[in-house]
Amino acid sequence: MSTNNSTQQQDELDQIKSKIQDNLISSGNYDIINKQLKLQLYESGWYDKVSQIASRELMDHQQEVNSSNSNSSNSNKKNELTFDQLFAFVKPKAEELVPNEVKQDILNRITKYLDDIIQ
């Protein structure tokens, strides 16, 4: 019985989230907040740092592939780094690099938006 109640609550929560998201987009506030986030990340050097992490990982991976290929005669596609693998490596590091001031500012903007639509 509690599983059914939990599922119902999750469905209601998902509906509320969807309505908020739809309103956020249709009101234009999503674009405003998104542009502000991108600007703050750019100004903080976040994009450059994340790009450096990705480039370093690609170079490290390529060096490992070259090293293993020189030790064995068969090179194959298993050595290729996929986008998903690179993304999984970079994502947590990129999230950690978001400056606290940027996180706080964006959270404040979202909170203000929610306060305004709830009233």
UniProtKB/Swiss-Prot annotation:
Signal peptide: none annotated. It holds the Pfam family EnY2. The keyword Signal does not apply. Keywords: Activator, Chromatin regulator, Cytoplasm, mRNA transport, Nucleus, Protein transport, Transcription, Transcription regulation, Translocation, Transport. GO terms for cellular component: DUBm complex; nuclear pore; nucleoplasm; P-body; SAGA complex; transcription export complex 2. Its main location: nucleus. It is found in: Nucleus, Nucleoplasm; Cytoplasm, P-body. InterPro entries: TF_ENY2 (IPR018783), TF_EnY2_sf (IPR038212). Gene3D superfamilies: 1.10.246.140. GO terms for biological process: chromatin organization; poly(A)+ mRNA export from nucleus; protein transport; regulation of transcription by RNA polymerase II; transcription elongation by RNA polymerase II. GO terms for molecular function: chromatin binding; transcription coactivator activity. Component of the nuclear pore complex (NPC)-associated TREX-2 complex (transcription and export complex 2), composed of at least SUS1, SAC3, THP1, SEM1, and CDC31. TREX-2 contains 2 SUS1 chains. The TREX-2 complex interacts with the nucleoporin NUP1. Component of the 1.8 MDa SAGA transcription coactivator-HAT complex. SAGA is built of 5 distinct domains with specialized functions. Within the SAGA complex, SUS1, SGF11, SGF73 and UBP8 form an additional subcomplex of SAGA called the DUB module (deubiquitination module). Interacts directly with THP1, SAC3, SGF11, and with the RNA polymerase II. Belongs to the ENY2 family. Involved in mRNA export coupled transcription activation by association with both the TREX-2 and the SAGA complexes. At the promoters, SAGA is required for recruitment of the basal transcription machinery. It influences RNA polymerase II transcriptional activity through different activities such as TBP interaction and promoter selectivity, interaction with transcription activators, and chromatin modification through histone acetylation and deubiquitination. This is Transcription and mRNA export factor SUS1. The lineage of its organism: Eukaryota, Fungi, Dikarya, Ascomycota, Saccharomycotina.
